[in-house]
Amino acid sequence: MTAATHTKAQVLAAALPWLKQLHGKIVVVKYGGNAMTDDTLKAAFAADMVFLRNCGVHPVVVHGGGLQISAMLKRLGIPGDFRGGFRVTTPEVLDVARMVLFGQVGRELVGLINAHGPYAVGITGEDAHLFTAVRRDVVVDGVATDIGLVGDVEHVNTEAVRDLIAAGRIPVVSTIAPDANGVVHNINADTAAAALAAALSAEKLLMLTDIEGLYTDWPDRNSLVSQINTDELTELLPTLEAGMVPKIEACLRAVTEGVPSAHVIDGRVEHCVLVELFTDEGTGTKVVNP
């Protein structure tokens, strides 16, 4: 036996306690950031999802697509804007977001996963009443600000997702959803992932980002925290960069609504999901109740 082979065996053996803990459990993964634009990282993420599925864990993927939406808006000559970390969504922007999220980003991820076998099924928040949206405003510099057709999740109907899980599939969810009157909204993928994780009674919520985790005093690299509770995080929230706010709000929502832990991890690292779930050290920042 070579040293490399022995090392691989040791890695697998070390993962056993975590495999036992997560067997049969649902893990919701919010897929976004650089992990969606680098071909190597995309392939690694898809392989991670298939690995989880074949280890008896039930992954549910909720994906973003902000970079791809911005690129398409630019290509079409449609202006785009962000306020409070959320995209301002006019009806014209919504049409583009709907097309890109399900027709481009979602289909690509489904294809990458299904290169390993017939596992992934793509759905949107519109399918089987998965999400019911309610229009939201955001607070910018202390002022409530209208950001257009942007929704929060008012209700989650998990039946379709649970049916897919029971059939051995990996749901891949695009976050477009109607409100109670049928008006379609764009839901921030972080927000949707948190709501879905809570509704599914998931064991964990993983949030892929483009940084190593949560910094309490950015840009001080020494302020990276490995674990933080919801009380501490609530106090920290007003000091965070706008782009991090939806992610941290999502972690808070998931954990306060019953998900045992939420994890902010670095999606720029290959197999970051497996490192977080199946090693003692993990990666990034873990959010728990006090």
UniProtKB/Swiss-Prot annotation:
Molecular functions per Gene Ontology: acetylglutamate kinase activity; ATP binding
GO cellular component: cytoplasm
BP GO terms, sorted: arginine biosynthetic process via ornithine; L-arginine biosynthetic process
Subcellular location: Cytoplasm
Pathway the protein contributes to: Amino-acid biosynthesis; L-arginine biosynthesis; N(2)-acetyl-L-ornithine from L-glutamate: step 2/4
Domain of life per record: Bacteria
Catalytic activity line of the entry: N-acetyl-L-glutamate + ATP = N-acetyl-L-glutamyl 5-phosphate + ADP
Keyword Metal-binding: no
Pfam families cross-referenced by the UniProt entry: AA_kinase
Site label Transition state stabilizer, positions: K30, K247
EC class name: transferase
SS bonds (residue pairs): none
EC number: 2.7.2.8
Keywords of the record: Amino-acid biosynthesis, Arginine biosynthesis, ATP-binding, Cytoplasm, Kinase, Nucleotide-binding, Transferase
HAMAP family assigned: ArgB
Function statement: Catalyzes the ATP-dependent phosphorylation of N-acetyl-L-glutamate.
PANTHER family: N-ACETYLGLUTAMATE SYNTHASE, N-ACETYLGLUTAMATE SYNTHASE, MITOCHONDRIAL
Record family assignment: Belongs to the acetylglutamate kinase family. ArgB subfamily.
Official protein name in the record: Acetylglutamate kinase
Gene behind this protein: argB
